């Protein structure tokens, strides 16, 4: 099947005229027509005929002997919070307050995709403004998990993860503030890669928590993530947090026998993680040991303060970043007798419940009298944790563990308890807090036949070694091969 090929293989077949790019486009659009109405993946979509025309232009360049980009002809999906200049596509963050908004410019990562001849075909559903772990916070209804449509796909990049898992795109870009690429990848049985902070430009990404946000890759394998990442990474003068230089390109293999992995004792707590998740985590850690790698257990000593500090900082940054949305230029606008009332009514109608909760809590922790007690203290904790983790990753090559405490949960299961939903991030926020690269890869199935993810994290700028290790594991195992039965019979 065409969709079984890697991204590099697909491009090679297109470049050698073995595969017509229009055939790949038609295959993807056929799957969108078949599954999207049920699963609710896309927020906006480039019409099929336009994508075919763009694919034909790539085919013509190849026929004429012209060079084409590294991603030539690949249909790629984009999360709904990454700016795209296309009259057919919105950048609405799955929020009513941005309903109908069309970006006048491309995000740098989208510009890079286009320069590499990728076909950006649509924007995908998400938790509103990237705030959530289940995709239930979208103003346009949730995306459904293709492994079990009664369960969540994860969040906030749930639509992007489902697009890749179902073949409604061959790859996707999402954003990861506390696990929003890795957790949905885990829940959908694919690979999700969050690079080092600044390795991919944030210019054009609608901000949630500016010191935590990072664009990431959703693909079937680590090899595909590396291929996509290398095509779009680089220095960006439009992003003040961009790395000062491009990372070296992905190449070669890695010997697992030379590596040292740390499995935190806190990650093996049966009160936090489910039995299936612990079993898969321990099994893969044992497998690494059998391959000759060194795997040691060690206590971190700070997990209890990680989630509170993360949410104080992210809520504070969100309350500042979302102050710019007022209902004046686009989206929901409520008429009123005064400007203040217009702002209040428009924001109240335009933002969903979870977004309003985070704005209010963020405003509170930044308010006079509470700033130092909450925001100031949270940043002190962050600095402490960052130093501890960087010291740990000087001793070990990788930190390993679960991605999420459990398997995909049922819709509505955690809606009445926001704290239970926030704890979905307990294993994933560490990478964002410390600016480290991290990756989620499939690690088996639960007793209910639901995907389980395994996470690896390395020191900043060590992205390609992280990808190599994940690719090496996937080359020797088959956890990444199963596809959702709903979409692959």
What is each residue range found by the language model?
Residues 1-54, 60, 290-292, 482-489:
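An N-terminal boundary/leader segment
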Residues 91-100, 272-275, 371, 409-419:
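Glycine/threonine-rich flexible loop motifs
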Residues 3, 73, 212-214, 237-319, ...:
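Gly/Ser-rich, acidic/histidine-flanked active-site/gating loops
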Residues 17, 73, 115, 169, ...:
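Glycine-rich, small-residue loops and helix-cap segments
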Residues 105-107, 111-235, 433-444, 450-453:
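Short glycine/serine-rich loop segments
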Residues 28, 51, 79, 113, ...:
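Conserved hydrophobic/aromatic pocket- or pore-lining residues that grip, position, or stack substrates
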Residues 194-279, 284, 339-345, 477-488:
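A short helix-breaking turn/cap at a secondary-structure junction
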Residues 70-109:
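Enzymes and membrane/adaptor proteins characterized by extended Gly/Ser/Thr/Asp/Glu-rich
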